[in-house]
Regions:
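FNR-like FAD-binding dehydrogenase module
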Residues: 1-184
Length: 184
């Protein structure tokens, strides 16, 4: 049944987003609405609504350039660009990526990649390494695109608590979302 699992999602049409809090407030809260008329879903306040977000195209293209690959390279029946946009997480860099890097490099770089793969932080920057930063850190390394994709984690949906009632606004789902920003 569509919309009941990550393997069979329902499509929702984005309707609107408006800021609930005043600009400059300590908190940044948004009211977001989706049209679910075509999805045929029932829900109650407090149910979860999962959103599969796409990765940033600019970031994806930078990663493809670092790999020295073409965006049209075939991976798992899709283009490399499609897989990087929609199927894998680009942050943080997983231990399996550093393990892959350790297999295709040598010397000090191999030791550093092995340390990162085992959870150590030889340069004190592991907390800041997303996939692009990891490739930049090991800039001479160009793993094969298929192996690279296999080393990444699947993109997870972002789950939000529904703040509207299907009975009050049939076909229209509302979320109340607090923006969280980190400065590293």
């Amino acid at each position: 049944e569509p919309g009941r699992s990550r393997d069979n999602p329902a499509k929702a049409l984005f309707l609107s987003r408006r800021q609930v809090t005043k600009p400059g407030s300590e908190k940044e809260t948004w009211h977001i609405e989706f049209n679910l008329e075509q999805a045929g879903l029932d829900y109650v306040v407090g149910d979860s609504f999962g959103v599969f977000a796409a990765n940033d195209l600019g970031l994806v293209d930078q990663i493809i350039a670092m790999l020295g690959a073409s965006h049209t390279t075939a991976v798992n029946g899709k283009t490399l660009r499609e897989v990087l946009l929609n199927d894998v997480s680009l942050s943080p860099a997983p231990d399996t990526l550093f393990e892959l890097i350790s297999f295709v490099t040598g010397g000090a770089q191999r030791e550093k990649a092995r340390a990162l793969a085992s959870g150590d932080d030889p340069d004190g920057d592991a907390a800041n390494l997303d996939v692009l930063a990891a490739l930049q850190k090991f800039s001479g390394v160009r793993p094969h695109p298929e192996a690279f994709i296999e080393a990444l984690e699947p993109l997870q949906p972002r789950l939000y608590s529904i703040s509207s009632s299907h009975n009050a606004t049939p076909g229209k789902l509302s979320l109340t979302v607090d923006a969280v920003r980190y400065v590293i």
